[in-house]
A protein has these predicted regions:
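Juxtamembrane helix-entry segments on the extracytoplasmic side of multipass membrane proteins
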Residues: 2-5, 10-11, 27-33, 105-125, ...
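Specific transmembrane alpha-helical segments of multi-pass solute transporters/efflux pumps
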Residues: 22-66, 74-76, 100-102, 186-204
Length: 257
């Protein structure tokens, strides 16, 4: 989205989500420090790294690197939370990741190693934040999201004012379509999507939910076909089937002789 800079759009998105949700939850006073750190690491720093990394890299490579969030999160759950990843789940995630590779196409890294580092760093700090969220067992997904959004909004706005420019002009000149996208991001992706995600993190093992992150390319393809009239290709079909097969295999309780 070209109208708004990266941190500005995220501050508006989380600000709207926070203002909507804060009325439905009580302040978690005993967890405020942890939530502040989660907001700083998992929102402000992560989005700053990821969006700046996306600027200097092609779409295929970006699509593959962003999907590292799932494997990194599963690995951290195994190391930090002592969860059992298991051979089947690891192979399933690997198979799904190969499907992402087929959909995205051959990555091109020449001269873009700095962008690669930023994207991998963004995925890593995001995974750290999700591990922290998984430890907030006494809070609901809506409570976590509401107060992460409230904490992250001023952080990202301050960061935007420091390293970006043209904020006021972007806001005042935005079209109805631009604001429609903002509200979609705030309500559908943030209020609905993150509420469900945070609830799962606080109630299910990280290694069990992380494979579902790899379904994102499939939802992106469906959205592009509906909204942008994109055509379904053979690589999309093969890659999509591999992703769904890989994710499904992580849910089956295989018993090996």
């Amino acid at each position: 989205m070209e109208q708004f800079s990266a941190l500005l759009i995220m501050s508006i998105r989380f600000g709207i989500a926070g203002l909507v949700l804060v009325w439905f939850t009580k302040p978690p006073w005993g967890y405020m420090r942890e939530i502040f750190v989660v907001a700083l690491i998992g929102s402000t720093i992560q989005y700053g790294l990821t969006y700046n990394g996306l600027k200097g890299i092609d779409a295929s490579t970006a699509a593959i690197l962003v999907q590292l969030e799932g494997p990194i999160l599963a690995l951290m759950g195994t190391i930090l939370l002592k969860e059992k990843l298991g051979l089947t789940r690891a192979l399933g995630m690997g198979f799904a990741f190969l499907g992402v590779f087929i959909i995205a196409g051959e990555p091109r890294l020449d001269g873009h190693i700095d962008s690669v580092i930023l994207l991998v760093a963004g995925s890593t700090v995001w995974a750290v934040a999700q591990i922290m969220i998984s430890r907030l067992k006494g809070l609901s997904g809506i409570t976590i999201l509401a107060w992460v959004a409230i904490m992250a909004t001023p952080q990202m706005l301050i960061a935007s004012l420091i390293i970006e420019d043209g904020q006021w002009q972007a806001i005042t000149s935005a079209s109805l379509v631009d604001w429609s996208i903002i509200f979609y991001l705030a309500f559908i992706m943030t209020v609905v999507g993150y509420s469900v995600w945070y609830h799962l993190l606080s109630s299910v093992d990280v290694s069990k939910v992380s494979p579902f992150l790899m379904l994102l390319p499939i939802t992106s393809i469906i959205a592009e076909m509906i909204l942008l009239d994109e055509k379904l290709t053979l690589s999309m079909i093969i890659g999509g089937l591999m992703i769904m097969t890989g994710v499904a295999s992580t849910l089956i309780n295989w018993r090996w002789p």
